Amino acid sequence: MKYNNTSEINPLDYILGQERAVEAMELGLKINNPAYNIYIAGEPGTGKSTYALKVLNEYASKKNTHKDWCYIYNFENPREPIIVELEKGFGRELKKDMEKLIESLLEDFKNAFESENFEIEKNKLLDEYEIEKDMLLKQIKKYGEEKGFKLKQSKMGIVFIPLKEEEDESDKSDEEFYKAKRELENMAIQVVYKIRNLEEIAEKAVLELEEEIAKLVVEPHIKRLCEKYENYDKIQTYLENIKKDIIEYMYLFYLDEEELKDKYDKEHFIKYKINLFVDNESSKNKESAPVVVEINPSPANLFGKAEYDYANGNIKTDFTKLLSGAFHRANGGYLVLYADQLLKYTMSWEILKKTLQTKKVILETQTAIKPENMPLDVKLVLIGSHYIYDILYRYDEDFEKYFKVFVDFDSEMDKNEDNEEGIARFIAYQCDKNNLRHFTKSAVEEVIKFSTRLSGDLEKLSTKFNKIMEVVIEGSAYAEFRNSEYTEQCDVKKAISEKRKRINRVETHMDESIENGFTLIETEGRKVGVINGLSVLSTGEYSFGRASRITATTSPGSKGIVNIEREVNMSGSIHNKGVLILGGYLSENFAQDLLLSLNAYVCFEQNYGGIDGDSASSAELYVLLSSLSGVSIKQNIAVTGSINQKGDIQVVGGISEKIEGFYSICKTKGLNGEQGVIIPRKNQRNLVLSDEVNDAVRDGKFKIYTVERVEEAIEILTDVKFEEIKKLVKEKLISFSKIQTVSKE
């Protein structure tokens, strides 16, 4: 590209270097099948989360599946609240409509039952009752007087008293007196029965009147709501039940204010409330499908929960206290979860699988309430590491059933013109987005060099854009400190060097230890059975190369090669394997006509923290051959590379860091033009060295040797032909064998 600075080029609008991942993601999003959920794997910083959200929002914008979800009271089974799906915005409308309905009815009922017309109609019914009641009482009163008794009403009923108490009852026979009294009492029973029957008829008539008025009050409101929600069968049924319930319990609507407050806050009026479970009217992107990211996937956060009231040691809840989870809010769209966080909650993972299996979002409570489950319509995107993917795939048989699409993010991409241009456009995008100083072309080239260094391969670029982004932000900051309009190459270099300075405390202390002579490393002279091996140490995000003194001693015996680190449990399995390979090499090259009879001890001197990896196996072989042959090894050359049993030198990691680590030691002790390193030839493409080391190599102050075979390396280290060394080693092993044979005799 021809440009002076990144303000002149188009910002990057796509994910860079992830063609395989993009194709897989597109496939997963296009297949509308509940088993085709997506697992995105990749190293931190490769942009998988950023890309996932970007592409999900793009797909979400193409389909408007936002729905509202409400829980309503179940009149047939109150323990099982009903879930209702409504068009976006209708949930909020329904909630408001029901609140207005109750408010209106409270006022309308009060007006209706306090109206003059109602009192007139009610009194008319009651007057009819009173007239008939009076007629019955008059009849029995008259008849009683004819029989000589006065009628008296009490709480116990009707009582008859003789009219003339002073009159001698002997004037009448006892039989006549009691006969008349019994007759009147029987008649009174019939009258009381008829009066009570009249009361029931009157009460029923008044109730029918009240119900008729209640219907006149309620039906217009319910009819209006039924028309508004005519497309929702569950709402139609609910409103019909509401009407019946209000008419049945209409007395609640004309209680005084204090009584009503208690009733409304507690029991009956809960039936008329709406739980707006998922309100998508309030979502940011109302015209697209939901995209939900849940960073704390606890069971409650994923699948919802119920809130509880505690009273007298008991817990109580109802459908209005049900709260939605991420699965509910994402329904009709996409849900993004992070695998490492999800697996912290074992129950979440198990319920998730059950949800995918049943195709229903399972909301569990601690009480008897069992809400109807929401039907599942979610594309699940799980983001995590390759390690977690492998573990789930291998040990969870359900994982493969529900995550059919694997989106694999690479940590590197080919170093070509298109991708280099992509990095320049990435920088342009970040500068525009974050208001940074735009980068000059030379500054961009320095960032590209940094990306190559991150990849550890001259033919690759890193896709760890979080690391690249750090350099971009910090480089821009240093340009701003200089009051420069643009970020220059020097700003990028300073950002990289200053970052290293902030995190290389351990490396600095180890350099000081070598300089002070506390750690024994020599960069001049020759020694038998001593070699400088190269390794990489990591402290958090920082890795650096170190030289370690490796020594070997040999003697007659039968122990074979003894890895001292292994004996004290300070070496890992890969390092142990590398040491065992040494025995295979020695057996093939020196023990075809004799038994190996030696004790060989190999040790990383002054190693107090353990070791793993096989990159020092070649150095261990060279130092063994030196000890056996008596040929000294140059201390000005350090070695890295693994070997196989056939003597081939194999590639290793961290090659640039190892070279720079030994160069730093040589620089501290004084460069003499003879110092250098031996590396595997196939590692040449991994040499992404600092400018200082490149300059030193170019100027002949430091050397890098590449080898493919053990024979090449040992000759560089000793200036002795391999055949001569082989002869000396063979002679020593023969002498060891003889000594061992004599000792056995």
Language-model regions, residue ranges each:
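Peripheral, non-AAA+ core regions of ATP-driven protein-machinery
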Residues: 318-320, 327, 333, 339-346, ...
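Conserved ASCE/P-loop NTPase catalytic core
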Residues: 1-393, 398, 404-416, 420, ...
